[in-house]
Amino acid sequence: MSGQESRTLGAWGEALAAAWIRKQGGRIIAANFRCRFGEIDLICEEKGYLCFTEVKLRKSTAYGSAGAFVDFRKQNKLRATAQYYLSRHSTTFQPRFDVIEVYAPYGLETKFPKITRIENAF
């Protein structure tokens, strides 16, 4: 898969995750928030939480779950990016780190991708 195809598939997965969050009653505050520390795919408010969400799309679980790809190094980058965000955006919501797994065996051709959320993932 080329870099462009991978980015397209990733953006599609993030759009699916955002729609899923909205369907669950959440409100998207920011998408693809970037700073010098890293990037957070989705930031949303939901049930008293400010959720910093990493979206992982995989075609299969052959090499492990999608959530398993959020390793310690990535977690540290997400924490630093979230701290930066919170230093510039005050909130009364409790911060939380989630991972949304999107499984799409046929890539963009998948009609019913499986979406799951790991709340308080780390």
Feature-to-residue mapping (PLM):
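Residue-level signal for inorganic ion chemistry
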Residues: 21, 78, 97
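Acidic-basic catalytic patches of nuclease active cores, encompassing PD-(D/E)XK
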Residues: 1-31
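Short acidic/glycine-enriched loop/turn segments that link adjacent beta-strands
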Residues: 36-38
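Mg2+/Mn2+-dependent nuclease catalytic core
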Residues: 59-87
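Hydrophobic "anchor" residues on beta-strands that sit immediately upstream
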Residues: 27, 50, 94
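Short, solvent-exposed loop/turn elements at beta->coil junctions and helix N-caps
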Residues: 31-34, 103
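Domain-level recognition of nuclease-like catalytic cores that cleave nucleotide substrates
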Residues: 88-122
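Conserved catalytic cores of phosphodiester-cleaving nucleases, focusing on short active-site segments
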Residues: 42-61, 78
